[in-house]
Amino acid sequence: MKLRIFAFFMAVILCFGCISLFGCDNGKTDETTAEETTASAETTGEETTEAETDAPEIPDEGYDGSAVTIVFYHTMGQNLRNVLEAYIAEFNKLYPNITIEHSQVGGYDDVRNQISTEITVGNQPNIAYCYPDHVATYNISKAVYPLDALIANMAEVTRADGTTERMGLTQKQINDFIPGYYNEGKQFGDGKMYTLPLSKSTEVLYYNATFFAEHGLTPPTTWDEMEELCRRIKEIDPDCIPLGYDSESNWFITMCEQLGTPYTSATGEHFLFNTAENRSFVKRFRGWYENGYVTTQELYGAYTSGLFVAGAGEQKSYMSIGSSAGATHQRPTKENGAYPFEVGITTIPQVDSSNAKVISQGPSLCIFDKANKQEVYASWLFMKFLTTTVEFHAEFSMASGYVPVLKSVATNDIYAEWLSGADGGDGIAALSAKVCLDQVDAYYTSPAFNGSSVARDQVGLLIQDCLTATADDVDAMILQKFEAAVEKCKYLS
C-alpha cells in the first residue's frame, strides 16, 4: 500500500511539474570525478502509448548562432570523459557559441532519479543518457522532445568555418546506424522517435577455449546443445558448475524473444509472461540447476565471471554468459607472464540458430523540451555530432568496451587495426566487439512503458525462485510463482 501511495504521489508531482516545465531555468550540475558505474538492470524498449508527448513540430529552420549553454548528464568515468571532452572541443570549432556543460551523475539509475526530480520543477538538463524505460517515466510529464521533425529538418546551418550542414540527418547517416540500435528510439507506441543510440552492449557466451580444445568440445549454438555440453563437462569435472549466467532477467526475456512467446506489451494488458511455454522453459532450467549445470549471479552471490576465471583448486565454470562490455573481467589473471587459459567468445545459444535473438543494451541519448527552441536546436546539433561522428565512436568503443552503433566504424583505420588484434588474451575486448559486430541483425528490444522495469525485476526474481524452491508438485509451484509475479507487477506499477 505504501508503494501505491508513493507511486500516486510521484505521478501527481510529475503532472504538476509539466505545468511549470517551460518557465524555469535549465538545471546545471558540477562535474564530478566519480568512476563510471553500471546499471543494476539494463532495460530495453519497444513501445508505449503512455509515453506520448504533444511537443510542437519544429519547422524547417535551424540554429541561428545564439549563445546557449547545453547541460548534458551521463555516467562516464574519467577515461570516457577524456574522449568526450576532446570531441566537445572539435564541436566548438564548428559552433563556438554552444557551451557544453557535462556532468557524471553516478550510474544509470542515478541519472534517471535525478532527472525525474528535476522535471518536477522544470530544471531538467538538455541532453541525457537514457534507457527506454527512463524515457517512459520522463514522458509521464511529456518532457522528452520527439526527434522526428529534427531528423527530417532540411534547413542549412552555417558553421564557424564557413561550411554548412543540414540540420537533420541525411539518408546516408540514417543508413549507417545499425538498425536494431536506431529503431530502439522509435518503439514507444506513438510512432515518434525519442532517442538516438550512443554506445551499446549485448550478452555473449565466454568459454574456456583451452579446456574445450583439450577435450574436443564445441561451443553450443542452441540450448539443446548447451544441455548436452553441460552434461559432458560435468562428467569431465564433477565438481564444476559448467555454466554461469549473470542476468536472470535477461535470460527470461531472451528466452521469450527466441521462443516468440509473450513477455510484456506496451498497450492493453502489460504483463503477459504467464504462459505454458514460458513455464516450461523455466522448469527445464530448474532441472539444469538441480543437476549442477548452471548458476546465476544472484544464486552464486557474485558475478559468475568469478567462477569462470577461478584458479586451480577452486570450484569453477567453463562457460559464462555476461555483458560484452565486461570482457576483461572474463579473462584470468596472468601467471608467470601468461594467461592460464585462452578465452573464446561466441553468440549465446539460441532456440533456433537460424533466427538468432540477442538483447540490445547500453545508453542512448534524449533531448528535453525547453521554452527557448534555440536550446533544442543546439542540443540536437550536439547529439547529431556525437552519434554520427565515426572517429568519436571508434575512440569511445576502444576506451569503453561498448560496441559502436555505426556500421562504418568497422572500416575506420584505427578501429580496424584495434580489431585486428582480437584474441582471447590481451585483445579480448576487441574479440568481444568483433562478435557483437558479426551479429548486428540479431538484436532485439523489449516494450518500454511505465512499469516495464518492474516486469524486468520480477521475471529475474521468478527465475531465482523457481530454480531453488522446494516442491512436491513442481508444475503447481511454478504456476503459483508465475501468477504471483504477474500480480506483483500490477501492484508495483
For the regions a language model picked out, list residue spans one by one:
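Hinge/lid segment of periplasmic solute-binding proteins
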Residues: 55-62, 133-202, 342-349
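Extracytoplasmic/periplasmic substrate-recognition and gating elements
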Residues: 93, 99-101, 121, 191-192, ...
